[in-house]
Amino acid sequence: GEIRCAKVYKDVTTRSFKQAVQYQEGRKVRNTRSARAMERGSKFGKQQQEHTWHTAEVDALGLLANTEVRVPETHGLFDGVLLMELITDADGYVAPRLADISMTSEEAIINHVTIIDFVKKMLCIGMVHGDLSEFNVLVDANGPVIIDLPQAVDASANNHAQEMLVRDVRNINNYCGQFAPELLNNRSAHEMWALYGQSQLYEDTPLIGIHPEDTHQADVGAVVSEIQSVLAEEAKRQQRLNESED
């Protein structure tokens, strides 16, 4: 028979309340009774809160199954246990986490490009992982697979979405950067968020990993003109120095 993976969720009482509130901001609860109970924090409300936490991952995985983002296939949620496809390596053993493998510089760059591309494709459908790191990425024979999505947030409805996106990308930068230091200063999160805010982010949008530190949109033309002006001035200065030496 086919071997599958069973994910058993932690009890709601072991989860940080502050974190739960941040992640659940913007999530819609159709049942008004459940929504009121969750706001009051009653026993029933906590049960409903836990249920929405579980179903959020199923919903996120379902949405991503229709994209090019590699995630495990789901096989149902039963009493707080999520059955999923078991991700394996080339030899059929459980695939290691990104955190558990050593990489050459080239391998680190390839994995980084793939993961950032997944992050971009998630943002294209309005989703931010919210807790992405080397511990939530498996690596099978075909490359990275994204896992652990109960906290995934709606990019347009959650006020913390940009902060979470930046943190997600920074975590991947920091880990892959141990093997390829040039990745440490990658600014893809800021770049893709700016494009997303302008409705100009698409699945095939190329990212260069560079973006201004501030949150305002830079006038690229003006910046280029200023750089060219400085270079021209420096060239003239060098020419004057050469002429005076002659």
Model regions and ranges:
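Catalytic-loop of the protein kinase fold
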Residues: 124-134, 139
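Regulatory N- and C-terminal appendages and interdomain linkers associated
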Residues: 106, 114, 121, 145, ...
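Conserved ATP-binding subdomain of kinase catalytic cores across diverse folds
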Residues: 1-94, 124
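A glycine-rich phosphate-binding loop feature that marks nucleotide/adenosyl-phosphate handling sites
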Residues: 80-82, 136-139, 189-197
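An alpha-helical support segment within catalytic cores of ATP-dependent transferases
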Residues: 92, 100-124
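Conserved protein kinase catalytic/activation segment
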Residues: 136-148
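Active-site Asp-x-Gly
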Residues: 10, 16-33, 94-96, 106-110, ...
